[in-house]
C-alpha cells in the first residue's frame, strides 16, 4: 500500500546541533540516563484520537484536515485505512507505544451487536499491526461521552439502561486491551458530573459511579488482566463540574469505595491547569498518596479556560515533573502519552510529526535535567534539613501517636518552648533550579 507519509523514512536522533525539523535533537532512545535507556524512562505513546480522528472541526468551523480516511465510504474499510496510516506514523516517529478509545479504532455501528462485531474485527487488525511493527499498547479505554445517549453521563446517568450500555462498552474495551497486551486501562469520566444541581442527586450519582468502578475492578480480576486501572482527573468540560475534579478528589473517592489499592491516576497536564493546579502539583500529590500511574503529556493555555491539548514545549515545567517521577522510581506500567493535537491551521500532514518531535525532545531534555537534579541531591538535602526536627525524639513521639494533644500542650509548657521561624529559602531554591535548567 502507498505510504501516506511518503517523504519520510524514519525520525532519528541527530543531536543538539541539528537543524533538521524531522530529527530528534535531544531524544536518543538508547542514551543511558541514571543507568537506564531513555526510551525505557520515558515510555512515549502517541494517541489515536487527536492524531487520526480529529478532523480539524471546532465550535466555529467545519473540519479542515481532509484526511483520506475521513472521507465518505464503508466504515470498516476506512477504519482499516486509518490503522495503516496510524502504524506507519508510530513506526516512523519511533514511539514504542500507542493509546486508543474503542470508537477511535472501530466504527460504533447502530447497535451493541454491530459495535462488538466491528471492534472484534479491528482488534484482529491492530494485533497484526502490533506484531508487524513492534509497537505496543500502553492503554485502551472506552468512549462513554460522545454519543448523545451519554448526555447525562454514563455511570452517573439517571437511566440504568444507559449505565448498562456503558458497562458493555467498558467490558468490551477491557477485553480488547487485554487481548492486545495493553499495560493499563483508563477510565475518564467525560460527562460524569452535572450542569445544574437543580436536577441532580449527588449522593445517588456518587453511589452509581462508585459501584461502576467496583464492577470494573471485579471484572479486571475475573479476566486475569495484570495491567493497571487508571482514572484520569478533570475538573470540568464538557460538564460544568466533574466528580473526578483533581488527584486529591479522586483519592477521596477511591477511599470511600475501598478502591485505593486497586486504581491509580493518569494525570493530564492541561487538566491540572483547568483545576487551578500546576502539573507539578498533581504529579507530586499522586506520588505522595501512592496512586501515581501514568501521564498524558500536553499543555494548556493560561489565558484560555478550556482544554486546548497543545504539545508540551516547556522544559522548565516538565523538568520538575520528571524530577518527581524519577525520585519515585519512574514509571512501572505507565508512560508519557501525548494527548495533544496540532492546531486547526496546521494542515500539512507533516505537522503531526513536528508536534510530536518537539514534545519528545522537550520531555527528553526535561529528563536529563531532572537526572542532574537527582544526582546532585541538593534539593533533597535542603528539604530533609527543613524537616529534620521530625526525626527528633519529640517529632517521632508525635508521629507515632505516643503523645495526646493535652500531653503535647503540657510538654510545650514544661519545656518553655519558644520556636523561631526558619527561612524557607524559596528564592535560593528557585535560583538553584535555574542553574540546572540553564547552566551547561
From Swiss-Prot:
Cofactor(s) named in the record: Mg(2+)
Signal peptide positions on this chain: none
Transmembrane residue ranges: none
Sites where the protein binds Mg(2+) 1: 232, 268, 296, 339
Gene3D superfamilies associated with the record: Divalent-metal-dependent TIM barrel enzymes
Top-level taxon of origin: Bacteria
Xref: SUPFAM superfamilies: Xylose isomerase-like (SSF51658)
PROSITE patterns: XYLOSE_ISOMERASE
Annotated family: Belongs to the xylose isomerase family.
Protein name (database record): Xylose isomerase
Species of provenance: Salmonella dublin (strain CT_02021853)
Phylogenetic classification of the source organism: Bacteria, Pseudomonadati, Pseudomonadota, Gammaproteobacteria, Enterobacterales
Gene: xylA
